[in-house]
From Swiss-Prot:
Cofactor note: Binds 1 zinc ion per subunit.
Binding site for Zn(2+): 108, 110, 135, 137
EC code(s) of this entry: 6.1.1.17
Organism: Dehalococcoides mccartyi (strain ATCC BAA-2100 / JCM 16839 / KCTC 5957 / BAV1)
Motif 'HIGH' region: chain residues: 11-21
UniProt catalytic activity: tRNA(Glu) + L-glutamate + ATP = L-glutamyl-tRNA(Glu) + AMP + diphosphate
Name of the protein described by the UniProt record: Glutamate--tRNA ligase
Domain of life: Bacteria
HAMAP family hit by this protein: Glu_tRNA_synth_type1
Top-level EC class as recorded in UniProt: ligase
CDD domains: GluRS_core
Motif ('KMSKS' region): 245-249
Length: 487
C-alpha cells in the first residue's frame, strides 16, 4: 500500500444516488483534498440482477453537479483501471481460485432451494440463519451452478481500529462462510472490493456505518490473500427528523431531486458536510476551500446525524443571497423557462432576468420558487379583482382620482427610475391626503396584479415606462367600469 492518501467512492448502480451515498463520496473527496491525495471513482456493477439503467450517469451527474471531481475513474482513466468492476472479472476469479487452491475457500454445490429450506428450519428452531458449512470439507470441484465460499476461521477474533469508532472486535465463530464468487462468475461485494482496493492501492476506506459488520470478512480476505489492509473509517448514519433512517417518506432522497428542486450545489456541499462532521459548535457556513482546510476524521461523529429540512432551506436562501445578479439569473433561467406564463411572455432573456433577480433575491429559498415570485414582471397577462385597487378605508372615487394623479405624475418624469418615482410619488400621497402605503398599495396592484410583491419602485423601473404606464392605464379603466360603492 502506498503512503499517498488514496480513497475511493465505489457506488453500485442499483438505483439513483441518495444523499447518504453522496455524503460518503463527499467525505472521501474532502479527505483526499485535505491530505493532498487522490479521489478515485469505481463503479461496482457486479449485481447484474439489480442493475438500473441510467444509474451510472446519475451518479456521475451528481458528482459533477457538486464539484466532486475525481482523479481516476470513469471518463478519466488512470493507472489502475478499468474502473468498472464488470470489466475486471478475471481478477476476481483468479483470487477466488487461489483461495480454493490454498484451502482457504471451497466450492459449494448447495442449490437455492436447499439453502432456503436450511434457513426456514433454522428460523423455526429459533437459531440465527446462516450456512451450515455442509460443503466446507467435502473437497468439491467446479460445476455448473456452484459458488465459491470463504472458509471462516472457526475460533478466535478479528479486531481492528476504526478511525472514527476506535477498537472494534468481532468473534469469528459468529461469521458465516460467505460467498465470494457467484455461480454466474461475478464476485460478491466482499471479494471484489478487497481485490480492487488492494489493486488500486487504496490507503483509507471511508464508508457507511452499515458496512461495519462486513469489515471482519474483508480483513480475513486481506489476510488470506496476503494483502495489507487499508485503514477503515465508518461514517455515521443519516436519520430523518423523526430519527428513523432517512427514506422517501421524509422527502426527496435522490441528489438529482434536490438539483431539480432548486438547491444550489454550494448549499448541498456545505449542508452534507455537517451531517456527521462539525468544525466547532457554532459555525455553519463554509466555503469549499474552508471545508477542505478544516475537514478531518477526528471531528466526525460516531452518532447518527439528523437531516433538518428547515436548516437546508435556510442555508440555501443564504447562499442564494450571496450570488451576483448575473450568476443568479444564469441559474434561474432553466427554472423560469418551465413556467408557461413566463415562457410565453416574450420577455424571458438573460439581460432582463439580471434586472429582475435582485428584486426577489432576498425572498427566495430555492430556485424553483423564483418563477412564482416574479412571473408578473415578465408576463403582461395579469388579472385581478379591480376591487383590490381600493384601500379598505377609501372609496372607488378616491382611489380612481389617486391613480389618475399618480399616472400623470409618472408620465411627466424625465427619468423613469426608482429614486425619481419615489421622490415624486411620496409627496403626492400627502397632497392627496393619503398615507403613502395607501397610494403605494394601489400602484402595486395596478403594476403587478399582486398585493404582496417586490419593492414597488424598483419593480416599476424594471418594467419600464411603457409597460408600467400601460398597466396603470388598464387599472384605471377597470376601476372606472366598476359600480360605485359605499364609503
Amino acid at each position: 500500500m502506498t503512503n499517498e492518501v488514496r480513497v475511493r467512492y465505489a457506488p453500485s448502480p442499483t438505483g439513483y444516488p441518495h444523499l447518504g451515498n453522496i455524503r460518503t463520496a463527499m467525505f472521501n473527496w474532502l479527505f483526499a483534498r485535505h491530505n493532498g491525495g487522490k479521489f478515485i471513482v469505481r463503479i461496482e456493477d457486479t449485481d447484474r440482477e439489480r442493475y438500473v439503467e441510467g444509474a451510472v450517469e446519475s451518479i456521475l451527474e451528481s458528482l459533477n453537479w457538486l464539484g466532486l471531481d475525481w482523479d481516476e475513474g470513469p471518463d478519466k482513466g488512470g493507472d489502475y483501471g478499468p474502473y468498472y468492476q464488470s470489466e475486471r472479472l478475471p481478477l476476481y476469479r483468479k483470487a477466488a481460485e487461489k483461495l480454493v487452491a490454498e484451502g482457504k475457500a471451497y466450492y459449494c454445490h448447495c442449490s437455492s432451494e436447499k439453502l432456503d429450506k436450511m434457513r426456514e428450519d433454522q428460523i423455526a428452531r429459533k437459531e440465527p440463519p446462516g450456512y451450515d458449512r455442509c460443503c466446507r470439507d467435502r473437497g468439491l470441484g467446479q460445476k455448473e451452478g456452484a459458488v465459491i465460499r470463504f472458509k471462516i476461521p472457526l475460533d478466535g477474533q478479528t479486531a481492528f481500529t476504526d478511525l472514527i469508532r476506535g477498537e472494534v472486535t468481532f468473534d469469528n465463530a459468529k461469521q458465516d462462510d460467505f460467498v465470494i464468487l457467484k455461480s454466474d462468475g461475478f464476485p460478491t461485494y466482499h471479494l471484489a472490493s478487497v481485490v480492487d482496493d488492494h489493486a488500486m492501492q487504496i490507503s483509507h476506506v471511508l464508508r457507511a456505518e452499515e458496512w461495519l459488520p462486513s469489515t471482519p470478512k474483508h480483513l480475513m480476505l486481506y489476510k488470506a490473500l496476503g494483502y495489507t489492509p487499508p485503514l477503515y473509517a465508518h461514517l455515521p448514519m443519516i436519520l430523518g427528523p423523526d430519527r428513523s433512517k432517512l427514506s422517501k417518506r421524509h422527502g426527496a432522497t435522490s441528489t438529482i431531486e434536490y438539483k431539480q428542486a432548486g438547491y444550489l450545489p454550494e448549499t448541498m456541499v456545505n449542508f452534507l458536510s455537517l451531517l456527521g462532521w462539525a468544525y466547532d459548535d457554532k459555525t455553519e457556513l463554509f466555503s469549499r476551500e474552508q471545508l477542505i482546510e478544516y475537514f478531518c476524521l477526528e471531528k466526525v461523529s460516531k452518532t447518527a446525524a439528523i437531516f433538518n429540512y428547515e436548516k437546508l432551506d435556510w442555508m440555501n436562501g443564504m447562499y442564494i443571497r450571496t450570488l451576483s445578479a448575473q450568476d443568479l439569473a444564469c441559474r434561474a433561467m432553466p427554472f423560469l423557462e418551465k413556467d408557461a406564463r413566463i415562457a410565453a411572455s416574450g420577455h424571458l432573456n438573460l439581460d432582463y432576468t439580471v434586472k429582475v433577480m435582485p428584486l426577489i433575491q432576498e425572498r427566495a429559498k430555492k430556485l424553483n420558487e423564483l418563477a412564482e415570485l416574479c412571473w408578473f414582471i415578465y408576463s403582461d397577462d395579469i388579472s385581478y379583482d379591480p376591487a383590490l385597487l381600493i384601500d379598505k378605508k377609501l372609496t372607488k372615487e378616491t382611489s380612481l382620482s389617486a391613480l389618475k394623479a399618480a399616472n400623470a405624475r409618472l408620465e411627466a418624469l424625465p427619468n423613469f427610475d426608482a429614486a425619481s418615482m419615489e421622490e415624486h410619488i411620496r409627496p403626492l400621497a400627502a397632497e392627496l391626503e393619503l398615507k403613502p402605503g395607501q397610494l403605494f398599495g394601489m400602484l402595486r396592484t395596478a403594476s403587478t396584479g399582486q398585493q404582496v410583491a417586490p419593492p414597488l419602485f424598483q419593480t416599476m423601473e424594471v418594467l419600464g415606462r411603457q409597460r408600467c404606464l400601460g398597466r396603470i392605464a388598464m387599472a384605471i379603466a377597470r376601476l372606472s367600469e366598476m359600480p360605485s360603492q359605499r364609503s
